[in-house]
Amino acid sequence: MQIGMVGLGKMGGNMAERLRRGGHDVVGYDRDPEISDVTSLKELVERLQAPRVVWVMVPAGKPTQSTVDDLGELLDAGDIVVDGGNSHYGDDQKHAAELAERGIGFVDCGVSGGVWGLQNGYALMCGGSQADVERLMPIFDTLKPEGEDGFVHAGDVGAGHFAKMVHNGIEYGMMQAFAEGWELLEASDVVKDVKGSFSSWRTGTVIRSWLLDLLVRALDDDEHLDELRGYAQDSGEGRWTVQAAVDHAVPLPVITAALYARFASRQDDSPAMKVVAALRNQFGGHAISSTEGSTGMGADAPGADVIPPARDRDR
């Protein structure tokens, strides 16, 4: 199947490569000419055969809005735009309505898998019409992990990114729990082998998980995380999750506390936040702050604007 990919960064570039390995014809566009197949969005659209599919993997907010606006002028009725970034579900509904006026389909797709997705596959959470999603299934089948799991058509437009938003909120809570446990073990003189304790939990315990595997990997590199500052950024989706909880009158004490702990880390050098920072670097390649300054181990480019769309701020 032929597909255009807009945005060839850490996620988009690997997704394009996985699609190529799966036998798809991928035409990629990026502002960096060194990695782009074409010089403009216009050329990308011209290279694709109708009916076209264009997957957008750029930061949410203004970059996505600008890209969708441009594609709306370039694409034809019957084409489909997929937003695979971390957009707000309210923006999805707006984009879908705008494109529908031109007969262009829209599917939102929350993507999880980080920098490991090229080999392991990406978990996909989609929102859109049944017809549009079914048409895209050859692409989804290639991107997702092997087996029956790893993909869901969560509902209408916006449902995919809403599900991904909640996924990321849960991730905040899990990371915070590991971080607090690590800080307690490090502070105690009872347990002598903290790293070994975490490593032993990877097999047979109820908390075994990929996040735990990544934490042990980080501790292998820096056993006491002495080289890291206790400072953790947030991509914005944790904030959106808490805001959605307020809108729906649903208590989220754990996720809210985890988000606030990240805010506090920017005021005080928090030992627990060293774990959160290390985990973010492990699964997403996000930048970390060392005791010597920036490590240069990755650019922290938030996947979402931290300010919700106007339609949500006003209600």
Residue ranges and their predicted role:
Residues 1-10, 15-18, 142-145, 281, ...:
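ATP-dependent carboxylate/acyl-activation modules
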Residues 67, 88-179, 183-185, 311:
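Rossmann-fold dinucleotide-binding core
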Residues 1-52, 78, 115-117, 281:
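NAD(P)+-binding Rossmann beta1-loop-alpha1 motif at the extreme N-terminus of oxidoreductases
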Residues 26, 106-107, 252:
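Hydrophobic beta-strand scaffold residues
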